[in-house]
Amino acid sequence: MAALGEPVRLERDICRAIELLEKLQRSGEVPPQKLQALQRVLQSEFCNAVREVYEHVYETVDISSSPEVRANATAKATVAAFAASEGHSHPRVVELPKTEEGLGFNIMGGKEQNSPIYISRIIPGGIADRHGGLKRGDQLLSVNGVSVEGEHHEKAVELLKAAQGKVKLVVRYTPKVLEEMESRFEKMRSAKRRQQN
């Protein structure tokens, strides 16, 4: 566990666990196939993604703040890590460079539309497309450590525009919800067109 004021770094703990697994394998006290399976999990990209999400969520809190705020950040980081362990639609951290050409994606949704904020389009040849980390259908959870869950569309746009140098996004892939949103918006547009005619 990190001391007060230290950032949480789980990578060291995971490496130590792998070392201990290797010692156990050499001892022959535990069936090797179980130890090897656990070692594969700890060394997997998935475990690394869960660790990154946990650390990112934990780091969004001011360490010098009250114990209650730190406990809340730890709880949120734990929930994010458990959500990631579900395997499907787990949160991911995506970093994109911010240049004059923009970020190369569009968003839709927001509190005013009673929906989460989603990546609705990846612009072909743009930064997001070249980077490859974002997908159409990703729900935008935070921008540079600021949550956009339950926020207005404009707040997310402002955070993305204000970012300098690079943008750190936490996203979760949920394409079905985006499809439902787009279908709902299309029905609303069709109803409006019928009213105008």
UniProtKB/Swiss-Prot annotation:
GO terms for molecular function: protein-macromolecule adaptor activity. It holds the Pfam family L27. It comes from the Eukaryota. Its main location: membrane. Plays a role in establishing and maintaining the asymmetric distribution of channels and receptors at the plasma membrane of polarized cells. Forms membrane-associated multiprotein complexes that may regulate delivery and recycling of proteins to the correct membrane domains. The tripartite complex composed of LIN7 (LIN7A, LIN7B or LIN7C), CASK and APBA1 associates with the motor protein KIF17 to transport vesicles containing N-methyl-D-aspartate (NMDA) receptor subunit NR2B along microtubules. It is found in: Cell membrane; Cell junction. It is a peripheral membrane protein. Component of the brain-specific heterotrimeric complex (LIN-10-LIN-2-LIN-7 complex) composed of at least APBA1, CASK, and LIN7, which associates with the motor protein KIF17 to transport vesicles along microtubules. GO terms for biological process: exocytosis; neurotransmitter secretion; protein transport; regulation of synaptic assembly at neuromuscular junction; synaptic vesicle transport. Residues 93-175 form the PDZ domain. Transmembrane segments: none annotated. Belongs to the lin-7 family. SMART domains: L27, PDZ. A motif (Kinase interacting site) lies at residues 1-13. This is Protein lin-7 homolog C. Gene3D superfamilies: 2.30.42.10, L27 domain (1.10.287.650). GO terms for cellular component: basolateral plasma membrane; cell-cell junction; MPP7-DLG1-LIN7 complex; presynapse; synapse. It comes from Gallus gallus (Chicken). The keyword Protein transport applies. Residues 10-65 form the L27 domain. The L27 domain mediates interaction with CASK and is involved in the formation of multimeric complexes and the association of LIN7 to membranes. The PDZ domain regulates endocytosis and recycling of the receptor at the membrane. Keywords: Cell junction, Cell membrane, Exocytosis, Membrane, Protein transport, Transport.
